[in-house]
């Protein structure tokens, strides 16, 4: 079985600019910078069906120095998901120094940290963004074993209208092949 492909993926790239394009109907994550440095994503219009799971808008993963601005994202899953690998990822590279500004998020899950965060997520600024009818605004999701730390997150001048849960923190996020894993009864961190 082959997983659905990403629409756009940059792997181990430096000095990437993706701007002023419309991306629609992605089979999986729409834009996936992986282990990249100095990435600028601006002026994107991303539209995926509201009932399409795992069709995230932009998912920087293990990246440094990323600027995402002036984008409109309307998807069936995470609008932006900041990631840094799972517990099985051999290269646990942190995702750090991200600026997300002047974006509009429609429907979907807003701006998400995780659930893949074994390398840590550091120094993220989300500012001057509008969330309209998203089911979440800012969401942190992880689970035991993922490891990693989250630090230096700044949220400034955000507008959330008709957002079901503006802030969600889930430390027992279920994931796996069928979307569920056995519940953990032991509350020890590792």
Give, region by region, the residue ranges found by the protein language model.
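Extracellular/periplasmic carbohydrate-active domains that bind, remodel
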Residues: 1-190
């Amino acid at each position: 079985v082959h997983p659905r492909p990403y629409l756009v993926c940059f792997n181990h790239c430096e000095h990437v600019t993706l701007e002023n394009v419309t991306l629609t109907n992605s089979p999986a994550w729409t834009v996936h910078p992986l282990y990249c440095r100095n990435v600028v994503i601006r002026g994107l219009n991303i539209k995926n069906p509201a009932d399409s799971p795992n069709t995230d808008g932009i998912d920087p993963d293990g990246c440094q120095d990323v600027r995402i601005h002036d984008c409109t994202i309307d998807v069936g899953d995470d609008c932006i998901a900041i990631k840094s690998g799972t517990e099985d990822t051999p290269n646990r590279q942190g995702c750090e120094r991200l600026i997300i500004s002047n974006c509009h998020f429609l429907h979907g899950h807003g701006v998400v940290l995780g659930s893949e965060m074994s390398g840590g997520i550091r120094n993220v600024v989300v500012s001057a963004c509008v969330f309209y009818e998203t089911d979440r605004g800012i969401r942190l999701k992880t689970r035991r074993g993922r490891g990693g730390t989250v630090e230096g997150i700044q949220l400034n001048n955000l507008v959330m209208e008709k957002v079901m849960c503006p802030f969600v923190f889930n430390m027992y996020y279920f994931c796996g092949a069928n979307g569920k894993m056995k519940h953990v009864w032991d509350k020890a961190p590792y």
